[in-house]
Amino acid sequence: NVVSILLPNSIDFCISFFGVLSSGNICHIIPTSISDSNLVNQLKLSKPSIIISNSVFQKKLSRTNSLQNCEFLDIELFNYTDDSDFSPKLESSSVAMILFSAGTTSTPKGIKLSHSNVAHTITRVTDFLKISENDIDVISLPLSHSFGLGCLNCIIKSGGTAVIHKNTLNIPNIINSIKDH
């Protein structure tokens, strides 16, 4: 099943993202700044059974009739529980996520990445950059963007610290967090 996530940079995004991946479902990340027409197109192509979002984006999803064929899960109503016995069987070749291209030359296209694609890339980047548990990554890019998501994946794999900015355009706040960390 495809599970779409429409959330800003936040701990809720991270929990949802890693939860979907670890559950064996396919994660489709929707940029929060997406246009109505692009939203409709991405949901038509990815065919999610569930959309994880919040009340802010529920209005956009309703306005575009995007909730007709899937279930809406409001992250604000979630109760997180420890399910340490949960261990799904993941096939390395199965699709882990669908990321859409920017569509600068034509209609955005969905790019399917397997668990092994993602794991290999994360391992290569963390090894090359020598990212460790002592590192702190100030993530100011949207997590819906492949580079922002890559930064999150690499720092989490390494056991380091991620400082995630919800407002990716608040430059003074980002500079202050760099100074603080």
Each model region followed by its residue ranges:
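Conserved S/T- and glycine-rich ATP-binding loop of Class I adenylate-forming
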Residues: 3, 20, 51, 95, ...
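Conserved pre-ATP/AMP-binding loop-to-beta segment of ANL
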Residues: 82-100, 106-107, 130-136
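Conserved AMP-binding/adenylation subdomain of ANL enzymes
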Residues: 119-136, 144-181
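ATP-dependent adenylate-forming carboxylate-activation enzymes
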Residues: 7, 28-44, 55-57, 160-180
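Conserved AMP-binding/adenylate-forming
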Residues: 1-34, 140
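Conserved AMP-binding A3 loop
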Residues: 96-123
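ANL superfamily adenylate-forming
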Residues: 50, 55-93
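Conserved G/P- and acidic residue-centered "switch" motifs that form tight phosphate/ATP-binding loops
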Residues: 24, 104, 159
